Amino acid sequence: MKGEHSVMPDAAVAYYHLPGLFEFYDFYRAFLPLYRRHREYFYDWCDIASLYGVPEGCLWGGGRMGSGNCDPRDVLALTREYGISARLTFSNSLLRPEHLADRGCNRLCRLFAGSAGPQNGVIVHSELLLEHLRSVYPELYLVSSTTKVLTDFAALRQELERPEFRCVVPDFRLNRAFDRLDTLPQALRDKVEFLCNECCDFGCRERRACYEAVSRENLGEGGPVHRCASPDAAGGYRFSRAMENPGFIGVDDIRSTYLPKGFSQFKIEGRSLGSALLLEFLLHYLTRPPYHIHVREALYLDNGLDLF
C-alpha cells in the first residue's frame, strides 16, 4: 500500500490488539492461517500485535465477563505459532488483598509468564494487582486498562509517564483530543493505545459504574445492578452505530491521521459480541476491500466455525 497515502511515513505500522484470546479461540484458529497464507488480502501497513481476553470464571477479570473455556495451553500454542502476544484481561477494579491468592488466576499468570515466544502481558486496573504482578511475575508486561476511564488528559499523561506500563488505553472520548495529544513526545505517543470501535454513548457518565458492576459479578458479590441508560441500549452493539460515535477511529483515520502523527497502537473491542461481528472488525481494519469476499468465503465455508 506504500504510495497510496503519501502523508503516512513509509515505516509506519499500525499494531492491532484484538479481542477474544479465549472467547474466539476457534475463530482465530481458522483466521490466523488465512492471514499468514494470504498476506496479499490484508493491508501491508498493519499487523496483529496481541490477542486479549480471559477464560470464564476468572476472579481477576474485568471489563467484560470472560466466556472462553478452551485449554490455556492450546491458546498459548496458537499465539506462539503466529508470533502474537497473549494478554490476560485482569482489569477487575475491586480486588482486595485476599483475592491475590486466587489459584486459577495465578496459575494462568505462571503459564503465560513461562511461555516461550513473544512476551505476554496483563491488562490491569487494580494497583494492588499491579504490585502483585510486578513482584511475582516480572516476565509479564503491563497495560493500563481503559476501565480506569481516563477522560482527563493530565491524568492520562501521568499514567503514560509511569514506567511500569508498556501501553495505556485512555477513555475513547480522548481519541480526537489532538490539541492535547499533539503535545506528547514520541516516547509517550508510542504508549497510547486507542480504543477504536466503542459503541458507548459519548456523553455517558456511568461508564465507571458499568465496569464496577462487571468487577462485582466476577467476584461473585452482590451490589447495585447496572442498567445502561443509553437510548440505544436495547439494540445492543451495532458496528454501524459505533462508526457514528464522535470517538470512533476507522481504518482511514488510522492511515491518514494517527500514523502520520506517530500513534501506532489500536485496540479493537468485542470480547462479548460474537464472531460474526469480530469478522466485520477484521474486514474493516485489516482487509483490503477487493479481498473482503475472499476472507468471508474462507471463513463462512469453515464448517468448524459458528459465526452466528
Question: Where are the model-predicted features located?
Answer:
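Active-site pocket-lining/capping segments in soluble small-molecule metabolic enzymes
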Residues: 2-155, 159, 164-308
